[in-house]
Amino acid sequence: MGDVEKGKKILIMKCSQCHTVEKGGKHKTGPNHHGLFGRKTGQAPGYSYTAANKNKGITWGEDTLMEYLENPKKYIPGTKMIFVGIKKKEERADLIAYLKKATNE
């Protein structure tokens, strides 16, 4: 897949202002992502999602994250996530590799 260390840097630069990944991490503007892989959209306990996120009905995995992270508002119209996305496929792969590791520790 991608490079975990590069993915960690991407998360710190582009995601950590709004998200945490560690077990027991607090929700910020966006939800904590611990346990993300295999979870359906809009299901992180204790986070208030839009109906669009709750109703999307997909399960997060490498393929769904690859598409979502390219353009979140296109993938889930009505999401409150303001991030424009990551256009470079390699950067998305690196981030997903890190998320897969960090959200399961």
Swiss-Prot record:
The modification N6-succinyllysine is found at K56, K73. One of its GO terms (biological process) is apoptotic process. Transmembrane segments: none annotated. Keywords: Acetylation, Apoptosis, Electron transport, Heme, Iron, Metal-binding, Mitochondrion, Phosphoprotein, Respiratory chain, Transport. Residues 22-45 are annotated as: Disordered. GO terms for molecular function: electron transfer activity; heme binding; metal ion binding. The keyword Heme applies. Binds 1 heme c group covalently per subunit. The modification N6-acetyllysine is found at K73, K100. Heme c binds at C15, C18, H19, M81. The keyword Iron applies. Pfam families: Cytochrom_C. GO terms for cellular component: cytosol; mitochondrial intermembrane space. InterPro entries: Cyt_c-like_dom (IPR009056), Cyt_c-like_dom_sf (IPR036909), Cyt_c_1A/1B (IPR002327). It comes from the Eukaryota. Belongs to the cytochrome c family. This is Cytochrome c. It comes from Trachypithecus cristatus (Silvered leaf-monkey).
